[in-house]
Amino acid sequence: MALLSSSLSSHIPTGAHHLTLNAYANTQCIPHFFSTLNAGTSAGKRSSLYLRWGKGSNKIIACVGEDSVSAPTLLKREFPPGFWKDHVIDSLTSSHKVAASDEKRIETLISEIKNMFRSMGYGETNPSAYDTAWVARIPAVDGSEQPEFPETLEWILQNQLKDGSWGEGFYFLAYDRILATLACIITLTLWRTGEIQVQKGIEFFKTQAVKIEDEADSHRPSGFEIVFPAMLKEAKVLGLDLPYELPFIKKIIEKREAKLERLPTNILYALPTTLLYSLEGLQEIVDWQKIIKLQSKDGSFLTSPASTAAVFMRTGNKKCLEFLNFVLKKFGNHVPCHYPLDLFERLWAVDTVERLGIDRHFKEEIKDALDYVYSHWDERGIGWARENLVPDIDDTAMGLRILRLHGYNVSSDVLKTFRDENGEFFCFLGQTQRGVTDMLNVNRCSHVAFPGETIMEEAKTCTERYLRNALEDVGAFDKWALKKNIRGEVEYALKYPWHRSMPRLEARSYIEHYGPNDVWLGKTMYMMPYISNEKYLELAKLDFNHVQSLHQKELRDLRRWWTSSGFTELKFTRERVTEIYFSPASFMFEPEFATCRAVYTKTSNFTVILDDLYDAHGTLDDLKLFSDSVKKWDLSLVDRMPEDMKICFMGFYNTFNEIAEEGRKRQGRDVLGYIRNVWEIQLEAYTKEAEWSAARYVPSFDEYIENASVSIALGTVVLISALFTGEILTDDVLSKIGRGSRFLQLMGLTGRLVNDTKTYEAERGQGEVASAVQCYMKDHPEISEEEALKHVYTVMENALDELNREFVNNREVPDSCRRLVFETARIMQLFYMDGDGLTLSHETEIKEHVKNCLFHPVA
């Protein structure tokens, strides 16, 4: 810094002087020299420091010279050139085409998926050999020496796999196979049938029992340590030749004994717990008359056919038999591991189409599904089925998040059911079980918090800690599901939480992570074809590429608009057409919003041009002239403008006349006056900042925020773009998203604060005097910069929670307008996630986001 000071001061006061600096290096020291510089300048003049990019764009040339006191700032700067040149874009888009046959296939897939939603009943799932074996044990109720359900016994005989096991043939999970195989050979032995199948099953068991310890504990099905040892004991009584003395078997038996020792007998009957799911493994300790009191309304015990079959064989309870008949009527000759799964199926299907970015095709189906879930919502939480007496945090968190975002009235207090005295969250009440998938869903849920919801903040903290630890522990993946890339899902969720996760980017990511053959783990492995399905993935890929091709055409048109408007001649501003277009394309991506995207992009580009003009280029007199020209909409004033300002104004005038004409057609009334008024307010905010800068005035934090929430210009972009969202907007509706609305204020506030947190240091080094951090430090001179920055983040986080509430509850505003406001706030969180993603997009992740959203098709 001393060397730089010497280099500059030694040349004062004669003329303009230059010093080459590394880009952005040491610029924070620049303000320290102004007192020295000004000492040698002429009366009525001020020394100013100008920055411009040297050749190669890796150097900044600092130029010291005299300027009139009416200059708005002490710093005039040029910006790094735009990365997205036409030849770069052409190289990425030249081979990308969507075939007509793809569009036809999209229509077919949409129809087929709609039929899937419409046919949802109690839940589609696959056979469970384990549960079918238990149902097949039931003797005929008429007293004959036959099975009550002979079709289930026949299913076992016909569905043994080639290796001698029972279970799903396409996916091998040793724990699952050995459990199902043991259940089947016991049932066949009890009925004295299938000797060949029994022998093959025993051979499989012996082979796999030796290897099973190589499989991760996280792949052990729910209740395995309860039911497996109990069946081994039964097999031993039946004289089956199994390796009972293997270390693995002894270890599982010890786990069962330890678990039962910790279980108070009275808790089994006091309230419903997950033990109801495994009663077939607890037959020696269950009081069958007491347990009946915990039977579900549908006659089942926690929807488990195996558990329900065991209770029926012990009690003869008619409701148990009715439930089993009900299940077999649905599935024919077999049963699943649990049934119904109606809430689980609907919630996860909705989540799937939303994350894959294809939900717009299924609005009615989604509403029907969520209406169904909401009709069974319980303040204690929900489980996987409507008659489920034991709520779980997985389904509850998924339901809370999705229902809330769709406008249903649900309270976050429901999560308190799953929090223990230490503040930890678990899947089931009173248990210590939790897995990556359920904690991931709680984490996703926690980000749609409303103000004052401490339970959501606690859930966020707890789950983030758990998930980060899980990423470091390979064995943590996963207790409840075998997913294609759960690790990738977790990494995305932690890096791009709700307020940074734009729809197109989430869709792009989830297309890569989604597994059409994913399976879940209950007591046995099971599949959900209406959740994991190749059709979802195929549609998502085709639809993404189709939309992307439309976006590429729009971008080319917008880049031509920039050039034809003469903006390439403006050296004082940033050319960021591609990055700016990426914003609406990432959230208002649907084909019907093409005009909205174009207006959003053009308006945003003008906010950048005029921000740079008012911030660091024009004199106060020039800026007043420009503002007056906009206010009067008067071309006669143009001749008095400098050449570059003429280009700005003529482009501005022509563009917004065209936008106003299109708006008149869309809205059925003249909107030019409305658009001009929006801009007048915007330019007033720019002018105030220019005056502050010229006077070296640092306002109070509140004064700064009041103006800066407008000067960030998000409101201007949204208020004009809203005219093109496909809705006729009355004055009343416009007022609900207007300058005076809390919704718009929060969008501007959060956008300004996140911008300041990532740019205040660089801008301070360039001579800027006002930012949220600096203004708060002025109000509180006793605090450190770090403390001020922390305060700004706190204000922003609280405002984001309030923004959530406005977005969800502001139902008098059309959905497309609500989205426009809310998503504009979110895109700011993404752009300024790790730096100035607009000015320095080529140095941040925005560059890759642009590629993935606009240029790289999914394969």
Swiss-Prot record:
InterPro entries: Isoprenoid_synthase_dom_sf (IPR008949), Terpene_cyclase-like_1_C (IPR034741), Terpene_cyclase_plant_C1 (IPR044814), Terpene_synth_N (IPR001906), Terpene_synth_N_sf (IPR036965), Terpene_synthase-like (IPR050148), Terpene_synthase_metal-bd (IPR005630), Terpenoid_cyclase/PrenylTrfase (IPR008930). Mg(2+) 2 binds at D611, D615. One of its GO terms (biological process) is green leaf volatile biosynthetic process. It is found in: Plastid, Chloroplast. Its main location: plastid. It catalyses: (+)-copalyl diphosphate = abieta-8(14),12-diene + diphosphate; (+)-copalyl diphosphate = abieta-7,13-diene + diphosphate. One of its GO terms (molecular function) is terpene synthase activity. PANTHER family: (E,E)-GERANYLLINALOOL SYNTHASE, ENT-COPALYL DIPHOSPHATE SYNTHASE, CHLOROPLASTIC. This is Bifunctional levopimaradiene synthase, chloroplastic. It comes from Picea sitchensis. The gene is TPS-LAS.
